[in-house]
Amino acid sequence: MEISVSSVTFSLAVVVVSWWVWRTLKWVWFTPKMLERSLRRQGLSGTSYTPLIGDFKKMISMFIEATSKPIKPTDDITPRVMPHPLQMLKTHGRTNLTWFGPIPTITIMDPEQIKEVFNKVYDFQKAHTFPLSKILGTGLVSYDGDKWAQHRRIINPAFHLEKIKNMVHVFHESCSELVGEWDKLVSDKGSSCEVDVWPGLTSMTADVISRTAFGSSYREGHRIFELQAELAQLVMQAFQKFFIPGYIYLPTKGNRRMKTAAREIQDILRGIINKRERARESGEAPSEDLLGILLESNLGQTEGNGMSTEDMMEECKLFYLAGQETTSVLLVWTMVLLSQHQDWQARAREEVKQVFGDKQPDTEGLNQLKVMTMILYEVLRLYPPVVQLTRAIHKEMKLGDLTLPGGVQISLPVLLVHRDTELWGNDAGEFKPERFKDGLSKATKNQVSFFPFAWGPRICIGQNFTLLEAKMAMSLILQRFSFELSPSYVHAPYTIITLYPQFGAHLMLHKL
C-alpha cells in the first residue's frame, strides 16, 4: 500500500510538472511562433521573436541611451522619447510588428484603421501587459465591456460642462496662489527672476484636483498626490526590469515601498469616502465636488448596478493620475513653447487683455479665447501627455487588409502620428497654432490624426476639465508675466506615464 501511495504521488507530481512545463512552453514559444507565422504570411514586416523577452530589452536599452543626454529646444523630440518605435517606422514601415515579451504588437499609423480601433471598443480592448501598473489605479480607463459602460454612466455627471463651470472658482483660487508665489520671487529680485516653473505647476494642478475632487478633505488629497507621484517613479524603475521573470514579486526595497504606499493611499481614500457616506446618512447636503457628485450619481443607480467602495477608490486615484498629470504637462510645455515663440506669446496675451483686461477670468471669457485654444491644441499635438496607446485583441479580427488573430496587441503611436509629415505636411514638426484656426476638423482633414485624449466612445471624460483649467492658468500667467527660456534651461522631454521635462523647466519670468 505504501509503495502504491508513493507511486501515485510521484505520478501526480510528474503530471503537474509536465502540465506546468507545457503551459510555459506554450506561452513562451509555441503560441508566439504560431502568431508570428500567421502575421508573416500576410506580409507584415517587423522583428523576429526572441523567446520570453521579445524586443523589450532592446526597447529599454535604446530608451536609456536616448535619454542619457538632453537635446536642443528646436530638435525633434521623437528620437529621444520613442527611439524604438521610430526605428521600427523607418525600417519596417507604417504598419509593423514588434514584440512586447511574448506578445506580438502591431503598430498602425493609418487614420482609418486608428478610427476603427477607437470605435470598436468591445473588440479592441484595453491592454493589460504590465500588471504592476494596476497599483497606480485602475478605474474607468482600464475597464472594458459592461463594467466600462457602467462606470462611464455613473461618472459622466461629475464631468458635465455645467458641473465643471461650477469649479472655475477653484481653478482661479489655486492658479492665483501660484502666480502670487512667482510674483513674490520676481519682486524680491527686482523685475525679473529665473524660476523652475515645473514644480509649481505640478503643485498647483495637484491642489486643483485635491479641491475639486475632495472639497474640504483636500489636505488628505494632497497626501494622495505625493504618494501617487512616488509610486509612478517606483513603477517605472520596476518596468525597466520587466524582462526578468517574477521580478515584481521579489521583496526588493522598491517593491516593498510600492506596496506600503499603495496601502496608505487606499486607507486615506477609504477614510474620505466613509466620512462622506456617514455625512449623507446623517442628512447633510451632498458636496458639489467630484466625489460628492460621484456618490450622488452612484446612489441613483438601481440595485446591483452601482459601484462598490473599492470601485470608487480606484476612480478617485484616477482623478489624480489622469487629471493632475495631464494638466501639469500641458501647462509646462505650453510655457516652454511660448518661451520659444514670443510672437504667439504676445498674441495670446493680447487676446487675454481684450477679453478680461485686468479682471478675474471667468467661464464665459475663457470659452472665447480662440488664440489660446489654437495654442493648446498645437502643444497637445507636439507634446501629447501620453505618447502611445495600446489595445488588445482577444478573438480574430479584421483590420484593413489584415486578419489579426486573438492574442495580438495594437499600438497607436500618438506622438508619431501627431508629427507625421504625410498627415500634417512638411512642417509637421514645427509649432504653428494657426493650423487650428478653423477648428479641429479642418486641421485634421476629418481624419483621426489628432488624439491626445484618445478618440471615439472612450475619449477622455476629463478633457474639458483639463482645457478649462489650462486656459485659466495661462490667462493669469500672461496677465502678470512675460517669459523666455533661461540660459540654464535643459530640454529633455521624458516619459514615465506622461511626457514631462526630465530636468524641470527653468524660465526667466519678467513682471509686467
From Swiss-Prot:
- State the GO CC annotations: membrane
Keywords carried by this UniProt record? Heme, Iron, Membrane, Metal-binding, Monooxygenase, Oxidoreductase, Transmembrane, Transmembrane helix
The cofactors named for this UniProt entry are: heme
> Per UniProt, what is the membrane topology?
Single-pass membrane protein
Q: Give the EC number.
A: 1.14.-.-
InterPro entries from the UniProt entry: Cyt_P450, Cyt_P450_E_grp-I, Cyt_P450_sf, Cytochrome_P450_Monooxygen
Q: What is its main location?
A: membrane
Query: Which residues bind heme per the record?
Result: 460
Coiled-coil residue windows: none
Cellular localization per UniProt: Membrane
What family is it from?
Answer: Belongs to the cytochrome P450 family.
- The entry's protein name is Cytochrome P450 72A14
Native species: Arabidopsis thaliana (Mouse-ear cress)
